[in-house]
Curated annotation (Swiss-Prot):
Pfam families: Globin. Heme b binds at residues 73, 108. This is Globin CTT-W. Keywords: Heme, Iron, Metal-binding, Oxygen transport, Signal, Transport. SUPFAM superfamilies: Globin-like. Residues 17-159 form the Globin domain. It comes from Chironomus thummi thummi (Midge). One of its GO terms (molecular function) is oxygen carrier activity. There are at least 12 different components in Midge globin. Belongs to the globin family. One of its GO terms (cellular component) is extracellular region. Residues 1-16 form the signal peptide.
């Protein structure tokens, strides 16, 4: 029931926040090809996240950063984010965003990923965005408002 209430609020929020999409898309377009750097930043800030990835657990981050395996996995993560960003701001496809987020949350929950790890990932990711894009109050607000809605869906599953 909690999930359905959150989902309903997110759909309503998507309509109310169409004005946020241009800020999210503009900033994302500045970093969406920095896949390796984004994941490297997350792993550097929170090694416990790196340890959740069997292919990278216990390995030297500096050594794996340059590998094809790291590049492929980084691209997989950032491509998912790009898909979400491409849909943001279009109320007609909000249910698609919600379904993508639900699937991702369920997949990660099955692997033992916690809400706390997702929060840490988000902190590192937002730090990367702020330091690698043209960042202002409107951009920050857009990411916060839309991000909070998306996180509510993910967290409702991980809790």
């Amino acid at each position: 029931m909690k999930f359905l209430v959150i989902l309903t609020l997110c759909i309503a929020g998507a309509i109310a926040h169409c004005d946020k999409a241009p800020f999210i898309k503009a900033s994302w377009n500045q970093v969406k090809h920095n896949e390796v750097d984004i994941l490297y930043t997350v792993f550097k800030a929170y090694p416990e996240i790196q340890d959740r990835f069997p292919q990278f657990a216990g390995k030297d981050l500096e050594a794996i950063k340059e590998t094809a395996e790291f590049a492929v996995h980084s691209t997989r993560i950032v491509s998912f984010m790009s898909e979400i960003v491409s849909l943001v701001g279009n109320p007609a496809v909000q249910s698609s965003i919600d379904l993508l987020l639900v699937k991702m949350a369920n997949d990660h929950k099955a692997r033992g990923v916690t809400k706390e790890l997702f929060e840490k990932f988000n902190i590192a990711f937002m730090g990367y965005l702020k330091s690698h894009t043209t960042w202002d109050k409107k951009t920050e607000n857009a990411w916060k408002v839309v991000g909070d809605e998306h996180h509510a869906i993910v967290y409702s599953i991980l809790e």
